[in-house]
């Protein structure tokens, strides 16, 4: 089982780093969400347009944010609001390395919150709060963010869940 999980969680292709604009990535996630959940799901954005581009794998970053946002939309039954927000961070330590400049990406929703029973284990493989869920979405998101030397964390209560992704803009 351990071997199978490792194969499922390992990217099927090598990381392809290119210069990417985080807002283009978030807009792609936004368009995918609105197509998948047409109707009463609102996806708001609050972007810091002064953020520089970063070097990363575009597809991995899209998948990481999409997994988080899709979980939120599913938890809300396709209704409610998801907000995507970016900010710059200065002089921050990520994964034991110090960076002069990083970016903070928040995926926020007004859904039911993450159940207490899974909150401490939500990034583990096969942990899902949804009937029929694979329990791999957040694990994959965490792996992809870590591939980019970033961090991911979550604060959740009923009516307000925030996933915060911090990514370095420049190499350590």
Regions found by a protein language model. Name each.
Residues 40-52, 87-89:
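Conserved catalytic submotifs in the C-terminal HATPase_c
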Residues 101-102, 114-125:
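Short conserved segment of the HATPase_c
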Residues 13-16, 53-56, 129:
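Conserved micro-motifs of the catalytic ATP-binding
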Residues 1-39:
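Conserved DHp (HisKA) dimerization/phosphotransfer helix of two-component histidine kinases, i.e.
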Residues 137, 141:
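Short alpha-helical Gxxx[C/S/T] motif in the catalytic ATP-binding
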Residues 82, 87-105:
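Short beta-strand-loop-beta element adjacent to the nucleotide/active-site pocket used for signaling
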Residues 145-146:
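Detector for a conserved hydrophobic position within an alpha-helical segment of the HATPase_c
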């Amino acid at each position: 089982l351990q071997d199978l999980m490792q194969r499922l969680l390992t990217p099927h292709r090598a990381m392809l780093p290119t210069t990417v604009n985080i807002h283009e990535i978030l807009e792609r996630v936004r368009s995918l969400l609105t197509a998948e959940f047409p109707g009463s799901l609102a996806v708001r954005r609050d972007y810091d347009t002064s953020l520089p581009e970063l070097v990363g794998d575009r597809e991995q970053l899209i998948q990481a944010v999409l997994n988080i946002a899709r979980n939120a939309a599913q938890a809300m039954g396709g209704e409610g609001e998801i907000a995507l927000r970016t900010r710059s961070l200065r002089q921050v330590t990520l994964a034991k390395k110090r960076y002069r400049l990083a970016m903070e990406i928040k995926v926020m929703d007004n859904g039911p919150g993450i159940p207490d029973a899974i909150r401490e284990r939500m990034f583990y493989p096969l942990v899902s709060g949804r009937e029929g869920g694979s329990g791999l979405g957040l694990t994959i998101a965490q792996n992809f963010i870590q591939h980019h030397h970033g961090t991911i964390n979550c604060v959740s209560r009923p009516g307000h869940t925030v996933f915060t992704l911090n990514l370095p803009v420049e190499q350590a």
